[in-house]
């Protein structure tokens, strides 16, 4: 179990506990439940890297304490 953070840079930081085998799409669904926004409208980025829904956190080498940038589309 790892804990990751999503920051929308508007004052909202979301902590999420998930497994390394979860996909980015699964992570978006968990975040959407906490913020009340549809998961289809969430975009997770880090720098210029946009994370794709079907790839696992382990494949992206996301570790405990990782910070995502949360954007709305």
Swiss-Prot record:
Gene3D superfamilies: Phosphatidylinositol 3-kinase Catalytic Subunit, Chain A, domain 1 (3.10.20.90). GO terms for cellular component: cytoplasm; nucleus. Keywords: Ubl conjugation pathway. GO terms for molecular function: protein tag activity. Residues 1-73 form the Ubiquitin-like domain. The keyword Ribonucleoprotein does not apply. InterPro entries: Hub1/Ubl5, Ubiquitin-like_domsf. It comes from the Eukaryota. GO terms for biological process: cell morphogenesis involved in conjugation with cellular fusion; mRNA cis splicing, via spliceosome; positive regulation of RNA splicing; post-translational protein modification. Disulfide bonds: none annotated. PANTHER family: UBIQUITIN-LIKE PROTEIN 5 (PTHR13042). This is Ubiquitin-like modifier HUB1. The gene is HUB1.
């Amino acid at each position: 179990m790892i804990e990751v953070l999503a920051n929308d840079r508007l004052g909202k930081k979301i902590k999420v506990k998930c497994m390394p085998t979860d996909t980015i799409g699964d992570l978006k669904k968990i975040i959407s439940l906490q913020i009340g926004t549809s998961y289809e409208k969430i975009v997770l980025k880090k720098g210029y890297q946009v994370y794709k829904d079907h790839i696992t956190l382990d494949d992206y080498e996301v570790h405990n304490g990782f910070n995502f940038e949360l954007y709305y589309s």
